[in-house]
Structure formats: C-alpha cells, structure tokens
C-alpha cells in the first residue's frame, strides 16, 4: 500500500524555498534546487517518502502549512464550501448529489453513521490511495468531507450510465462500439488493480459514458465503507448489487471474499450486458432465489443469449470471466490482450470508426464534465 506523504516534508520544502528565493534564483540553478525550482529538504528522507517532492510547482504553491498534519488533510474539503443541489440517487453505500465546488461536482454522502476512530482512520488511509488515481477511464477524485457525514467529492459527468443506456434508453450500439466500451472498462480496471485497489462494486451503474463514448469508472475502492463494522472488528458483507456479485462473494465463506478475480466476475456480467442488451437471470424474479442459486453454483448467466454477431473470442472471454472457480478467471492484463487481438481482427472500417474515442482524451488529467448516476438502480 502507498504510504501517505508526511506534510513535514512539504513544509520543509516550502521553508527552504522561501529562504533561498532571490532574484538570481530564477536565472541560476543552485545545487540544492530541484528541476522544478523547489529546494530539496536538508533533512534525510525515509525511503518510502523519497517521491514526495515529485509533484509540480503549481500544485505545491497551493499547499499551505497547517501544523504537523498528515498530507491527506490537504484533500479535505470544508462542508461549508460545497453547495448541494439535486439529489441524483441512492446506491449501496450512499446518496449521490450534484453540487457546486469550483464548478460542478458529484458528492457522495456515505452511509456510515458515527464512524469509530478505527473506521475514520481506515477511511483516511483509503483516501490517501484514491487521491493518487489519475486515468482517462477513471472518474476523477477531488477530495473528501468529514463534517456531519463522511463524503467523497468527484468530477461531475453530464452523460448517462451504461446501465441507463442499455436497460432504460435501450441505446443501439454497434458491435465495434460495444467492444470498445469493454476495452476501456478493462483498461480502467487494470489501472485500479495495478494500484492495488479492488473496486468491489463493478456494475453498469458505475460505468459512465462521456462525450465520444469515453468510459469513466466511478465508485471504486472504499473498502472501509463497503463493509460492516462490529465494535473495532471489521466484518465483510456482500456489497453492491447481487446480479454482479461473484459466487464466492455471495457465499461469504471467506473472511474477505473480495479479490481481483471477484472484480473480474463483475466485469464479466458487464460484458454479458453489453453482448446481450439484457440483465442476467431475467427469468428469476426472486432476489433470495438468485442468491441461493448463484452462491451454490446452480445458476449462471445464459450465454446462448449473446448476440449472433458477437465474435467468438468475445464469447470465450465472457465465459472465462464468469468461471465459477475464481482462480480460473483471467486477470485484466490478459483480458486487455484478448480484446486488443479481437479489435485488430475486426473489419478495418469499424476499427477506424472507433479511433476518436480511443485517442481523443489521452491526457490522464482529463477532467471534462462527466456522468454520475441519473439512472434508476436495478431491482436487485
């Protein structure tokens, strides 16, 4: 796990910078200056903190020393600065509002009442990881709030969720577009897993389509919130919507059933939605029966419903992601390779048609306005 940066390092850097700042400093390049123009701290820095001076000068100028505080404090947003407007919807772990904070934002107020000190610290530790996520296919994390309720602030999206496109508006995508949505989603998930973040609630409601079909994944991480607490003891419980939950997560036999492979299973259900236009188990209208059947391995999504023009390699990928034994599922690097091969084998006219959405938003800081759930949540 990534260690939070100690704010003392930043304060030393600011202090040293102000001491050494002079008119000649801009023209010269003294030995103690870093390439960005920041003085290096004179005190030795522990190994895990060596990367602290690596952020750009502009960002550092925004940081004001506030005593001996953990650096995650600099990402805390005062509740009084945020203006909440429309209530967008409720999910498994909280309620989402559209808000204003230096522009449009989405504010997710979490369903954690009176957090214990352990819970609060765990939340802060996770925020330290979430704030380091920057990827074109990931919804941008902007900060957190702790007054009254724990809350997460992210970029706002104007479009619709994949769930809404597929199951409410019934948008007619072409096969190459469906495959590209699958690729971008896998790309975002691969990035999260490389950061050691397990999503735990991957589903079409948490995938947002922005502009030229650019995928944004939201509501990731936050294991603290997506678990039940009993005193100081953390007890995992099934989270998210059951249609997307892996059999081992439904069974809850392990103390922590969440893994990269449980995310892959959920992604497999998203692939199923993309390649059928339907939700799985539509013939079973009893939630408890789905939990029982899937958990025991008696039911699995009906792959005969996949579109007739769904490429064979995609059919294989859907089946592999939905394997009942989690160790048999591929991980995202392998999934991405499969999709890349698949896209390469598509007719060239289709491949070129999808290129604008592949390359338009190549900057990792892509913070264009983007969708949060303006969608009805599924029944299950």
UniProtKB/Swiss-Prot annotation:
Entry's EC annotation: 2.7.11.1
**What is this protein's name?**
Serine/threonine-protein kinase-transforming protein mil
Please give the function described in this protein's UniProt entry: By itself the v-Mil oncogene has only weak transforming capacity but it abolishes the growth factor requirements of avian macrophages transformed by other oncogenes.
Which PANTHER family has this protein been placed in?
RAF PROTO-ONCOGENE SERINE_THREONINE-PROTEIN KINASE, SERINE/THREONINE-PROTEIN KINASE TNNI3K-RELATED
Chain sites annotated for binding ATP = 88-96, 108
Q: Which family does it belong to?
A: Belongs to the protein kinase superfamily. TKL Ser/Thr protein kinase family. RAF subfamily.
Catalysed conversion reaction: L-seryl-[protein] + ATP = O-phospho-L-seryl-[protein] + ADP + H(+); L-threonyl-[protein] + ATP = O-phospho-L-threonyl-[protein] + ADP + H(+)
Bias-annotated ranges (Low complexity): 19-35
Give the Protein kinase domain ranges.
82-341
Comment field (misc): This protein is synthesized as a Gag-Mht or Gag-Mil polyprotein.
Give the region (Disordered) as residue ranges. 1-67
Q: Which SMART domains match?
A: S_TKc (SM00220)
Which PROSITE patterns does this one have? PROTEIN_KINASE_ATP, PROTEIN_KINASE_DOM, PROTEIN_KINASE_ST
**Which organism encodes this protein?**
Avian retrovirus MH2
Keywords in UniProt for this one?
ATP-binding, Kinase, Nucleotide-binding, Oncogene, Serine/threonine-protein kinase, Transferase
Q: Does the keyword Ion transport apply?
A: no
Alphabetized GO MF terms? ATP binding; protein serine kinase activity; protein serine/threonine kinase activity
Report the top EC class in one word.
Answer: transferase
Compositional bias annotation for Basic and acidic residues = 8-18
**Is Thylakoid included in the keywords of this UniProt record?**
no
Annotated active site residues, numbered on this chain, are 201
Give the transmembrane ranges. none
């Amino acid at each position: 796990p990534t260690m939070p940066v100690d704010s003392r390092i930043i304060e030393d850097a600011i202090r040293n910078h102000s001491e050494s700042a002079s008119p000649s400093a801009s023209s010269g390049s003294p030995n103690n200056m870093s390439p960005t123009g920041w003085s290096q701290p004179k005190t030795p820095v522990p190994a895990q903190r060596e990367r602290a001076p690596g952020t750009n000068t502009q960002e550092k100028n925004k940081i004001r020393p506030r005593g001996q505080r953990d650096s995650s404090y600099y990402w805390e947003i005062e509740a009084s600065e945020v203006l909440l407007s429309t209530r967008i919807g409720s999910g498994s772990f909280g309620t989402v509002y559209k808000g204003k904070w230096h522009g449009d934002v989405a504010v997710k107020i979490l369903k954690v009442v009176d957090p214990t000190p352990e819970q609060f610290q765990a939340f802060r530790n996770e925020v330290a990881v979430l704030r380091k996520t920057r990827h074109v296919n990931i919804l941008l994390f902007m900060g957190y709030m702790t007054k009254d309720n724990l809350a997460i602030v992210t970029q706002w999206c104007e479009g619709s969720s994949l769930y809404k496109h597929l199951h409410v508006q019934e948008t007619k995508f072409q096969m190459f577009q469906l495959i590209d949505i699958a690729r971008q989603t896998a790309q975002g998930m691969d990035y999260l897993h490389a950061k050691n973040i397990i999503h735990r609630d991957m589903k079409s409601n948490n995938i947002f389509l922005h502009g030229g079909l650019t995928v944004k994944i939201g509501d990731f991480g936050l294991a603290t919130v997506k678990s039940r607490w009993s005193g100081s003891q953390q007890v995992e419980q099934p989270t998210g919507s059951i249609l997307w939950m892996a059999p081992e997560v439904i069974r809850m036999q392990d103390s922590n059933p969440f893994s990269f492979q449980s995310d892959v299973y959920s992604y497999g259900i998203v692939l199923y939605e993309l390649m059928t236009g339907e939700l799985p188990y539509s013939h079973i209208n009893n939630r408890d029966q789905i939990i029982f059947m899937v958990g025991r391995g008696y039911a699995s999504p009906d792959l005969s419903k996949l579109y007739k023009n769904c490429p064979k390699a995609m059919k294989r990928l859907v089946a592999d992601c939905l394997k009942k034994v989690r160790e048999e599922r591929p991980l995202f690097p392998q999934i991405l390779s499969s999709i890349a091969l698949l896209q390469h084998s598509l007719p060239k006219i289709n491949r070129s048609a999808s290129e604008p959405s592949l390359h338009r938003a190549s900057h990792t800081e892509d913070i264009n306005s983007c969708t949060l759930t303006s969608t009805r949540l599924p029944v299950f």
